[in-house]
Amino acid sequence: TVRATYRTASSLEKAKHVFSYFTDQVDKEFSKIQWVQADVREVSSLEAAFQNIEKVYHLAALVSFDTSSYSKMRSVNIYGTANVVNLCLAYKVQKLCFVSSIAAISKTLNKPFIDEQDEFNLEENNYGYAITKYGAEMEVWRAAQEGLQVLIYNPGVILGAGFWRENSGALFSMTYKEFPFYTEGVTGFVGVEDVAALLVKGMDSEVTNERFVVVSENKSFKEIVDSIARVFEKKPPKIKVSKLLSALGWRLSWLKSKLTGAANTFSKHTAKAAHNSSYYRAEKVKKTFEFEFEPMEQVLKKVAKRYQKDLEN
């Protein structure tokens, strides 16, 4: 039996749509899963999902770089994770696989790449999302100390189809609309199908109480959007945004959010991250699970084709 939680009816419909990328028998495959409406912040709603469960994948999180979302992120990412691990312990779950983020790992000075040996540095990664993902990891390690078998995954920017207005999905919708601006920051990227495959491999293995950086390739944002633009046969961005312009942009976005009450869509951290270059090494996960990542060019082409198909439908 596979049981999965969803928070709202609309999110369940989005999940169902994702199934359409992989099967023509969406209803049949979707009905194989027991869907339970729950919120990680509400223990009573989660308890129904934990009945007779042996293995747990915890992926639920709030991703935001808007400082006004910090308290909500703490509630979902830290306290929600605490609820999940406490129930894992209470219901004697065999193993927990937790999806964290590369945001919870900081650079070490004079080291060319970031890997599992690097730790979180509050002075460097002092923005809300990173702090809350690190806090969530601490809850998972606490559960490990109490006897729960755990694995922590730190994926880079996850690229996948279906959620075109949110997070990395916006890269595809913006590129399709020929958004003209770009920055040259570098970070780690990975396809969602690789993340899913590694979660299953980890759960089915004897490996426990380890963490893994999950990154296919390190790419600049410019390289990513140029690749997407080629698939779409659209114009790639041509206007390079300087650090000065980004600094002005986040201040204007902040002012607009204060005056109108709208979400701050371009925060100070977003501006900084757009110009940062961080290189990640994922040798540990490749070696442990004898795994080869799908090349980013292939991932981008596949996801972009799915975006086009959704537009047609």
Locate predicted features.
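Active-site Tyr-X1-5-Lys
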Residues: 124-152
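Mid/C-terminal beta-alpha module of Rossmann-like enzyme folds, strongest
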Residues: 198-266, 282, 287, 294-313
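Glycine-rich phosphate-binding loop and adjoining beta1-alpha1-beta2 segment
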Residues: 4-29
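NAD(P)-dependent short-chain dehydrogenase/reductase
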Residues: 144-189
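Substrate-positioning beta->alpha
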Residues: 135, 166-167, 183-203, 210
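NAD(P)H-binding glycine-rich loop region in Rossmannoid oxidoreductase-like domains
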Residues: 23-79
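Conserved Rossmann-fold NAD(P)-dependent oxidoreductase catalytic core, especially the SDR/UDP-sugar
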Residues: 79-128
